[in-house]
């Protein structure tokens, strides 16, 4: 959805920089890893987190490294602000209602001007997690999205990188 005029001036524009995003999360993973490693007594969950750390931390670093100067998302932010591109901010199955052939979206409390692909990312990740990361499902979801709105090369790269990041592991660590 695009906003115009006065609505755009009132809308909050959210800056998103993947390098900062992944870098901050990777530092958090390291901090938690160091904290747990130094503990004398560790519970089963902490031992499992330590055991999996190297694999998921490497995956997180790979996502961070994919974001080079070549893939700078400042222009996606500027484009969102200039064109008033509205993102839901919390687009997931809890906020989607099917009424016959119509789809109704609710709960726009987190809506803001921003990179719209973030909504697809959140919905796709949650749906894929709930369905065992079936690649065919993910491909069909992206193809369905692109029937309405084609992804730019930068958006496609951002989506790939976001999905590469081990978000579930990061959440478990926090």
Residue ranges and their predicted role:
Residues 9-86:
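ATP-dependent phospho-/nucleotidyl transfer catalytic cores
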Residues 151-155:
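Helix N-cap / loop-to-helix initiation motif
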Residues 66-118:
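Active-site acidic catalytic loop and adjacent metal/ATP-binding pocket
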Residues 1, 40-44, 56, 79, ...:
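Gram-positive cell-envelope targeting signals
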Residues 1-9:
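Internal "kinase-insert"/substrate-recognition segments embedded within catalytic cores
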Residues 117-150, 163-174:
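Active-site activation/catalytic loop segments of kinase-like enzymes and analogous catalytic loops
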Residues 17-20, 109, 126-130:
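A ubiquitous short alpha-helical element
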């Amino acid at each position: 959805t695009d906003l115009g005029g006065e609505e755009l001036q009132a809308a909050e524009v959210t800056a998103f920089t993947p390098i900062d995003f992944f870098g901050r999360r990777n530092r958090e993973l390291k901090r938690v890893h160091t904290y747990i490693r130094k503990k004398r007594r560790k519970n089963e969950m902490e031992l499992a987190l330590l055991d999996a750390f190297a694999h998921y931390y490497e995956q997180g670093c790979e996502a961070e490294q994919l974001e080079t100067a070549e893939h700078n998302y400042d222009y996606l932010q500027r484009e969102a602000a200039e064109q008033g591109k509205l993102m839901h901010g919390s687009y997931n199955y809890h906020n989607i209602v099917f009424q016959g052939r119509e789809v109704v979206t609710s709960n726009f409390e987190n809506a803001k001007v921003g990179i719209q692909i973030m909504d697809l990312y959140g919905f796709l990740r949650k749906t894929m997690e709930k369905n065992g990361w079936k690649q065919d499902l993910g491909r069909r979801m992206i193809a369905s999205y692109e029937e309405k709105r084609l992804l730019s090369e930068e958006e496609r790269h951002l989506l790939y990188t976001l999905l590469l990041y081990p978000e579930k592991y990061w959440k478990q660590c926090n």
